[in-house]
């Protein structure tokens, strides 16, 4: 059995400043502390995350979060075995703030420095919480990303498909903005949809008529915009029932797309011949109740185990970064002072870029 390791994790890739301490012994892990300082109030007036504001907030808060995480864990820097930090992908200003702090701590203490792919942090969370064995199928669904991955190792992922445009979380945020709901959009739309009729509006289920596991959500967002504008033109505004029905219809369409694409991904994953096949979901959108329920049903029908992290570990956090750093460190991964912040960092570097990735290639 590998020796116990205690790592500090640092996360600053979007609008959550976070630090955590995780101790691992073999396949067992314990989160000794997890501090998340969100920036929702800073960005609320803008209807979305403003990169410059986010970067400044990270620079102001990161050292305080690290101090709190160590204090809550009852440890000092001398008690750690390493420092893990999100090195990408993400908003470059925030990622850079985290990387520079981690470098300074590593240089000052002599501790190993491990750069972590933010998405690997999400994808490896089921191993932190449940000790899930490789290989497993992962649906990574968040504000900026959506892809199906077969996780074979701490740094070995095979992408089966992903969104060619908007990620579901981004679509939820834009839907909330279009309907005048507060950010972040995911919880707001889900709460509003609870009292709505999902059948009132015939929203599309994009790309279900095409084979494979790729997805698209920008057309769904456009359909909602047109439905909203039609109601405004007809009535002069939206009632509470209109908003609830629009949210319910939008959410039902997202659920249907994710459920059907998951069925297809499970068919590809079956060829892996895993001894204990499992489907896991991670990322901020994994906190959505109807999405979890639909994926649970899909997994049960396929006869595979379904795992979803606790809600506090679905959204961005540093515990997953500390754990992913431990996993990478155990596999021989370690970085020096040349570690750089990366706005783009695909998990499966051998996979072709998805349509819509742009000239610079895949972001993740």
Curated annotation (Swiss-Prot):
Domain of life: Bacteria
Cellular component, GO annotation: cytoplasm
SUPFAM superfamilies the record matches: Actin-like ATPase domain
Pfam families per UniProt: TsaD (PF00814)
Catalytic activity entry: L-threonylcarbamoyladenylate + adenosine(37) in tRNA = N(6)-L-threonylcarbamoyladenosine(37) in tRNA + AMP + H(+)
GO terms, molecular function: iron ion binding; N(6)-L-threonylcarbamoyladenine synthase activity
GO BP field: tRNA threonylcarbamoyladenosine modification
Residues that, per the record, bind substrate: 140-144, 173, 186, 288
CDD domains assigned: ASKHA_NBD_TsaD_bac
Cofactor note: Binds 1 Fe(2+) ion per subunit.
Sections of the chain in a coiled coil: none
InterPro entries given in the database record: ATPase_NBD, Gcp-like_dom, KAE1/TsaD, TsaD
Keywords for this protein: Acyltransferase, Cytoplasm, Iron, Metal-binding, Transferase, tRNA processing
Binding site for Fe cation: 118, 122, 316
Cofactors that this protein relies on: Fe(2+)
Entry EC no(s): 2.3.1.234
Places the protein is found: Cytoplasm
Biological function: Required for the formation of a threonylcarbamoyl group on adenosine at position 37 (t(6)A37) in tRNAs that read codons beginning with adenine. Is involved in the transfer of the threonylcarbamoyl moiety of threonylcarbamoyl-AMP (TC-AMP) to the N6 group of A37, together with TsaE and TsaB. TsaD likely plays a direct catalytic role in this reaction.
The family this protein is said to belong to: Belongs to the KAE1 / TsaD family.
Protein's name in the database: tRNA N6-adenosine threonylcarbamoyltransferase
Species whose genome carries this gene: Cereibacter sphaeroides (strain ATCC 17029 / ATH 2.4.9) (Rhodobacter sphaeroides)
Gene responsible for this protein: tsaD
């Amino acid at each position: 059995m590998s020796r116990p390791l205690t790592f500090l994790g640092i996360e600053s890739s979007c609008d959550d400043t976070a630090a955590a301490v995780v101790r691992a012994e073999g396949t067992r892990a314990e989160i000794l502390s997890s501090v998340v300082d969100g920036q929702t109030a800073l960005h609320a007036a803008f209807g979305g995350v403003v990169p410059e504001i986010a970067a400044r907030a990270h620079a102001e808060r990161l050292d305080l979060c690290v101090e709190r995480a160590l204090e809550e864990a009852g440890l000092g820097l001398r008690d750690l075995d390493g420092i893990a930090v999100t090195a990408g992908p993400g908003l470059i200003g925030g990622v850079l703030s985290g990387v520079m702090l981690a470098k300074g701590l590593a240089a000052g203490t002599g501790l190993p420095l491990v750069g972590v792919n933010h998405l690997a942090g999400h994808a490896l969370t089921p191993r932190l919480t449940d000790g899930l064995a490789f290989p497993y199928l992962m649906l990574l669904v968040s504000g900026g990303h959506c892809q199906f991955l077969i996780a074979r190792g701490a740094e070995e992922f095979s992408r089966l498909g992903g969104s060619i445009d908007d990620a579901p979380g981004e679509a939820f945020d834009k839907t909330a903005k279009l309907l005048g709901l507060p950010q972040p959009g995911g919880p707001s739309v889900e709460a509003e949809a609870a009292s709505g009729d999902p059948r009132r509006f015939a929203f599309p289920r994009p790309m279900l008529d095409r084979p494979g596991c790729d997805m698209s959500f920008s057309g769904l967002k456009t359909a909602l915009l047109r439905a909203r504008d039609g109601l405004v033109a007809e009535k002069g505004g939206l009632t509470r029932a209109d908003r609830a029905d629009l949210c319910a219809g939008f959410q039902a369409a997202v659920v249907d797309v994710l459920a059907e694409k998951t069925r297809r991904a499970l068919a590809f994953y079956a060829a892996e011949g895993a001894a204990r096949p499992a489907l896991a979901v991670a990322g901020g959108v994994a906190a959505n109740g109807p999405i979890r329920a639909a994926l649970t049903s899909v997994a049960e029908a396929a006869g595979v185990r379904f795992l979803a992290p606790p809600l506090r570990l679905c959204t961005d956090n540093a515990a997953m970064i500390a754990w992913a750093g431990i996993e990478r460190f155990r596999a021989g991964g370690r970085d020096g002072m040349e570690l750089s912040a990366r706005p783009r960092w695909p998990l499966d570097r051998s996979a072709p870029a998805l349509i819509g990735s742009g000239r610079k290639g895949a972001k993740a």
